[in-house]
A protein has these predicted regions:
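Activation of the activation-loop gatekeeper triad in protein kinase-fold domains
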Residues: 244-249
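Active-site activation/catalytic loop segments of kinase-like enzymes and analogous catalytic loops
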Residues: 256-301, 315-331
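N-terminal mitochondrial targeting presequences
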Residues: 1-9, 15
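Catalytic-loop of the protein kinase fold
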Residues: 220-222, 227
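Juxta-kinase regulatory segment immediately upstream of eukaryotic protein kinase catalytic domains
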Residues: 12-42
Length: 332
């Protein structure tokens, strides 16, 4: 579901609009909930609700009330798989205890009687997200990309160094067998969504099975760490205000996280198809190469990155499966 969320809750430069028909919130119930949780003082206050125009995996709204701005995240009605609001809230709540780049969460409700689905309330994140639209409005000088790419990497390294036990997140995943499960599960997902007989897909699945690392570290990982989930300060490329989209955060191999990130990192020398798939600024002159990103990661962690070809190929395969799933739904 990475691509279904590529413009999900970019809470900064995402277009906000009136709430779409059929996706309205029960404002009376919501205001009672906000007051009970100390987020507003009066139920009579006007609740200005806007909906973020993008986002298909989960629905995201902005609440403007009593000079405060909140964001509410909820799944679409009827959604089950991949929309665990409680898990996402607990991950963010834990991260709030020791990682200052995750959005602050204020309250969670698993009661369907309030607005029809479980939901949680989080802070409204401000700053700048580097998207194609943003680049059209404000060109970034080539000389800035070295700073930008270093700044972008810092929170990912910090996340991989966190102690999940101290944050109360040690049960957020099953570290043993993580790589094996990922390879197996993404292979299964591809086969379920296959529409054509693509021999290369079978070759890649076999290669991934045969080239898995025997040993690997475990840490908290984001699992979708890319430019449109990174909120920079509006005033400085050396500061990141927040990292978004934590619904796939788990405990796993940190190099899986890095591999997915560099899979999204298209370069000017890449084939046209690969560059067309990722409309990020990574191929613009001034950006480091994927190899340079890996070297930066090694320098920051103080540890060598081994078997990176496996992790990069897995990242590309995972993205290809997501594209195939989208095509499968379209083709039906």
């Amino acid at each position: 579901s990475h691509f279904s969320r590529r413009r999900n809750y970019s809470l900064v430069n995402n277009m906000k609009q009136k709430v779409r028909k059929g996706e309205e919130l029960n404002e009376i119930n919501l205001k009672i909930f906000l007051k009970e949780n100390g987020l507003i003082s009066k139920i009579k206050s006007d609740l200005g609700v806007l909906q973020f125009s993008n986002g298909f995996s989960n629905l995201t709204y902005q609440l403007n009330i009593e000079d405060k701005e909140y964001v509410i995240r909820k799944p679409p009605k009827g959604a089950v798989y991949g929309h665990d609001m409680g898990r996402e809230y607990k991950v963010l709540k834990g991260l709030n205890n020791g990682f200052n780049k995750a959005p602050i969460v204020y309250a969670y409700a698993d009661d369907n009687n309030i607005i029809g689905t479980p939901f949680y309330i989080m802070e409204k994140v401000n700053g700048r997200i580097i998207t194609p639209r943003e680049l059209k409005e404000r060109t970034i000088p080539s000389k800035d990309y070295s700073t930008i790419s270093t700044t972008r990497l810092n929170p990912q390294v910090a996340l991989h160094n966190l102690d999940s036990h101290q944050l109360g997140l040690s049960e957020r995943g099953t570290p043993a067998g993580y790589v094996e499960r990922q390879v197996r599960n993404w292979g299964k997902q591809y086969l379920k969504a296959a529409t054509d007989d693509i021999k290369e897909a079978e070759l890649i699945m076999n290669w991934l099975n045969e080239n898995q690392p025997k040993q690997y570290k475990h840490s908290l990982i984001h699992n979708d760490y890319k430019y449109d989930n990174v909120v920079f300060s509006s005033n400085s490329w050396t500061k990141i205000n927040s990292i978004l989209d934590w619904e796939m955060c788990t405990i796993g191999d940190p190099l899986m996280d890095l591999g997915t990130s560099i899979a999204y990192w298209a370069m000017a020398s890449d084939p046209k198809g690969l560059k067309a798939a990722f409309d990020y600024p990574t191929s613009i002159e001034g950006n480091p190469t994927r190899l340079e990103i890996i070297k930066m990661y090694e320098k920051q962690t103080g540890e060598p990155v081994n078997n990176i070809v496996f992790y990069y190929v897995f990242g590309l395969f995972k993205i290809a499966v997501i594209v195939q799933q989208i095509y499968y739904r379209y083709d039906k």
